[in-house]
């Protein structure tokens, strides 16, 4: 079985994982983002139906992408936030793989880096970023 090699592995494809992906790309760092479900899954399936963003649309956004179809002073509904995060991942061309669960992360013994077990096989990474859970 071959082991995939990456410089930096980002675990999680939500707000934090996408923000990290953008910064790594801007710095020229080769990386891969793994998301066990779909982008922004928790916004879709683990939030109250009535949830809205905690700030107005003009504020709660990433650089270079406005919320569409909403007044800038309005508060985006959870589905709108999830759709926005998908659009942002596409905009920045995030190198993301959805449907891949990370099961174990271990430090390499005697050399730098990490050995990461996933639902699709092994990955060795120099750096691992945990971007799971709330932003």
Regions found by a protein language model. Name each.
Residues 2-3, 122:
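Short, flexible hinge/linker loops that cap or flank conserved catalytic cores
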Residues 9-11, 116, 122-135:
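Short hydrophobic core segments
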Residues 16, 38-39, 135:
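Conserved Rossmann-like nucleotide-cofactor binding loop
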Residues 96-100, 118, 132:
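Short loop/edge segments at beta-strand edges and connector loops
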Residues 98-113:
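A conserved short coil-to-beta-strand element within the FAD-binding core of flavoproteins
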């Amino acid at each position: 079985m071959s082991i995939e090699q990456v410089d930096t592995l980002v675990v999680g494809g939500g707000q934090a994982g996408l923000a990290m992906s953008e910064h790594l790309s801007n710095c020229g760092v080769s990386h891969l983002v793994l998301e066990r479900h779909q982008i922004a899954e928790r916004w879709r399936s683990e939030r109250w139906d009535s949830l809205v963003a905690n700030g107005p649309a003009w504020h709660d956004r990433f650089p270079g992408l406005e919320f569409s179809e909403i007044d800038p002073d309005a508060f985006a509904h959870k589905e709108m936030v999830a759709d926005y995060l998908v659009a942002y991942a596409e905009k920045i061309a995030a190198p993301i793989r959805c449907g891949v669960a990370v099961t174990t992360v271990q430090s390499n013994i005697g050399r730098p880096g990490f050995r990461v077990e996933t639902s699709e096989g092994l990955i060795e990474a120099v750096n691992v970023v945990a971007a799971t859970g709330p932003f």
